[in-house]
Amino acid sequence: MERLIIKGGNHLSGEIDCSGAKNAGLPILASTILLDDSAFIGNLPHLQDITTKLELLNSMGSNINFHEDGFIEINSSNIILPEARYELVKTMRASILVMGPLVAKYGKAKISQPGGCDIDTRPIDFHLAGLEQMGAKINSDSKYIYLEANKLNPIDFDFPKVSVTGTENLMMAATLIDGVTVLRNCAKEPEVVELANYLNSCGAKIEGVGESNISITGVSNLKSNRWNILLASVNSLSPGEVLELKVIRSDEQLDLKLVTKERPNTPQAL
């Protein structure tokens, strides 16, 4: 279809429901691995990547329940298989985000290498370099990356290049490390800020988020909080998430109202 012809003349008004941002939801789902109890996440978009992430968590042993109020309950306190299998990782690069939380909480992770490529040609070298500096032992073969750590240590790490998922992975891992971790040249995207805000609502101590340098003071555990995912913005949407129509009127003003669920102002212990 080359064009749309719109014949006006009627006043436009109404409400639309805006779903949460996929790129904010994916790391928050991964971060639920860090919690000691159930996480309650709302306003998740109905997209394949979100479904795949939930399938990945479920395959590792997380218990997932869908509530009538739209919230998804995820309990990852007793993961029995800290592994991201190929059939799930190959469809979504963000599956790599379970690596940091798994090593921090369970001391090990087995992550499939999409396409069977070598470790030093993968675009996750910043993740691995940071985790190795924290004390993780890393090995690999043609199919998997293996990480083990009896104890992770705080680090001062400078990303050679800005990495959104790298920032998220190391930030999540650092939340449970005793001491202060400093990450430099961090990504500043809204989804990074949203992840830090969620973790802080669960008891983490993350400062400087949204700036180049982030400081994380480790805590012994994280507790659940009800959380609605950040609204999707035009700048952060992936193709296919929304169709944007630009309407130009010369005689009247067009008002659009965005409707979403209210986010609690204070943490709610569950």
PLM feature segments, named:
Residues M1-A232:
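Structural preference for solvent-exposed beta-strand-turn elements
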Residues K223, L230-L270:
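C-terminal recognition in membrane/secretory proteostasis and scaffolding
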